[in-house]
Amino acid sequence: MPRVFLVVMDSVGIGGAPDADKYFNGEISDFGSNTVLHIAQYMEKLGRPLKLPQLNSLGLGSAIFHSVGIEHPDLPVSNNANWAVGRETSKGKDTPSGHWEIAGLPVTWDWHYFTEKTNSFPKEIIKSICEISGVNGILGNKHASGIEIIEEFGQLHVETSMPICYTSADSVFQIAAHETAFGLDRLYELCEKLSPMIHSLNIGRVIARPFLGSKDEGWRRTKNRKDYAMVPPSPVLIDWVKAAGRKTYSIGKIGDIFSMRNIDFNVKGSDADLMQKLEEHT
């Protein structure tokens, strides 16, 4: 009986979509983006070839050439592989949009975004966070990188218990909190209770971003991230597989992205741990 292993390599891009010029990272346009090809070109300048023999044997170089019409010696075109290039039709470039479309549900609507770079969140959201967590306020309230904002507010968070709240160019509301000083279960409870309000604004995800450490030792994010995503409004691949009487397994954040609907087994961990789990099922 056939099985399918669908692996999404996050941010391993092989060329921008036709509408890439409409999307940005900060002030930088996504037009011309091609992560794998650009890495190969950079490594070539350093005199250190990019070695991806397994991926090339599966057709990576062929896919890149088809995508952008550029062939690189470290990404050779293969005549003995089955490959394809997908062109996303969903409007967003966020995680739910891409994963849902891969699973058969293109996102044809516009997500809402917190566009203000500072003071990003409405007072109603901040009030709800305070009521749920019993705190006097929040930290952050801006666009930020997860690592940088923990460095900026980690110590004050530990001292005050005020959660660190931030967003990005994606349709997300992220909350970082110390696993012991604030409490992991408390963070999960906050995100779970807050998510209906956030989803009602058409924001795709609330993300719990737990971390550990101290000011002296440094801060580190843990593997206990949890995404509270909107429920897919229509059936997706996982639902069809389940309806056919088969078992479904998810690793990493996939279960969260699909709201655990029709997921039989869900495994989380580091990237290495997750790949080991994948190998155990091959």
Give the label of every model feature segment.
Residues 1-282:
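…; additionally, a secondary subgroup of soluble metalloenzymes is captured
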